[in-house]
């Protein structure tokens, strides 16, 4: 499955547009990750635990979107948009939403 943020795939013209496909993943903030992230922020480092969690959530959302596209008979998803939203009381959760257009290319 080809997946891109661009509206076209060079050398692979779109033969048919199948519709919008989406994927979502929600992760909860862990108190230990928060503690270590705060310490890292104080000393100027990166919050690796959060970065891994974000990457995992993004992969889950992308896989969900690809699965929807396959069910429609697509061989590619173009125009992918990735959004991040903070949710929940005290901003305790993070949602990753992805969307794109399922297509059949040559």
Swiss-Prot record:
Family recorded in the similarity comment: Belongs to the UPF0145 family.
InterPro entries, per the entry: UPF0145_dom_sf (IPR035439), UPF0145_YbjQ-like (IPR002765)
Protein name listed in UniProt: UPF0145 protein azo0572
Origin: domain of life: Bacteria
Gene3D superfamilies attached to this UniProt entry: Hypothetical protein apc22750. Chain B
